Amino acid sequence: MASMQKRLQKELLALQNEPPPGMTLNEKSVQNSITQWIVDMEGAPGTLYEGEKFQLLFKFSSRYPFDSPQVMFTGDNIPVHPHVYSNGHICLSILTEDWSPALSVQSVCLSIISMLSSCKEKRRPPDNSFYVRTCNKNPKKTKWWYHDDTC
């Protein structure tokens, strides 16, 4: 538990001092608990999401960094994207099976920025309605099927 807290403190400072472009730690979100953060995000310039504002929710288990954080979009504005479900769940392999303790909150943020920035068409995943109706609240409990860089 102490190593998890030490690691989160280090990552918290890194996110406060050197946030990825368009990302800001929501300071209020960490006042009560170091294991749940909200990161405010703005769509990158020159992309389909330019000027749009989103929020990412990070939840860390006591096994972090050996266990990936639970990461999902939250709030009123969930991006319309082929890998983002309308409930905020994100289909991104580094959030599950490709997670490594060498990754960090910053690297997850950069991957999500890159995923949104490379989008050519705003649309939901083809199985959005079914998935949202039947999924677990925790996206990490989903058995994602990654193929051809899509879900």
From Swiss-Prot:
* An example Gene Ontology biological process: DNA repair
Taken from the UniProt entry, a GO cellular component term is: nucleus
- UniProt keyword annotations, A-Z: ATP-binding, DNA damage, DNA repair, Nucleotide-binding, Nucleus, Transferase, Ubl conjugation pathway
Q: Which InterPro entries match?
A: Ub_conjugating_enzyme (IPR050113), UBQ-conjugat_E2_core (IPR000608), UBQ-conjugating_enzyme/RWD (IPR016135)
* Family matches, as SMART domains: UBCc
List the Gene3D superfamilies. Ubiquitin Conjugating Enzyme
**Which Pfam families does the record cross-reference, listed alphabetically?**
UQ_con
- EC number(s) recorded for this UniProt protein: 2.3.2.23, 2.3.2.25
Q: Where in the cell is it found?
A: Nucleus
Q: Which residues cross the membrane?
A: none
Keyword Transferase assigned to the entry: answer is yes
Record's CDD domains? Answer: UBCc_UBE2W
GO MF terms listed in the record are: ATP binding; ubiquitin conjugating enzyme activity; ubiquitin-protein transferase activity
Question: Which residue intervals define the domain UBC core in the entry?
Answer: 3-151
This protein's pathway reads:
Protein modification; protein ubiquitination
* Reactions this protein catalyses: S-ubiquitinyl-[E1 ubiquitin-activating enzyme]-L-cysteine + [E2 ubiquitin-conjugating enzyme]-L-cysteine = [E1 ubiquitin-activating enzyme]-L-cysteine + S-ubiquitinyl-[E2 ubiquitin-conjugating enzyme]-L-cysteine; S-ubiquitinyl-[E1 ubiquitin-activating enzyme]-L-cysteine + [acceptor protein]-N-terminal-amino acid = [E1 ubiquitin-activating enzyme]-L-cysteine + N-terminal-ubiquitinyl-[acceptor protein]
Write out the catalytic residues in the record: 91
Its predominant location is nucleus
Q: Which family does it belong to?
A: Belongs to the ubiquitin-conjugating enzyme family.
Summarize the protein's role. Answer: Accepts ubiquitin from the E1 complex and catalyzes its covalent attachment to other proteins. Catalyzes monoubiquitination. Involved in degradation of misfolded chaperone substrate and DNA repair.
The protein depicted here goes by the name Ubiquitin-conjugating enzyme E2 W
From what organism does this protein derive?
Answer: Xenopus tropicalis (Western clawed frog)
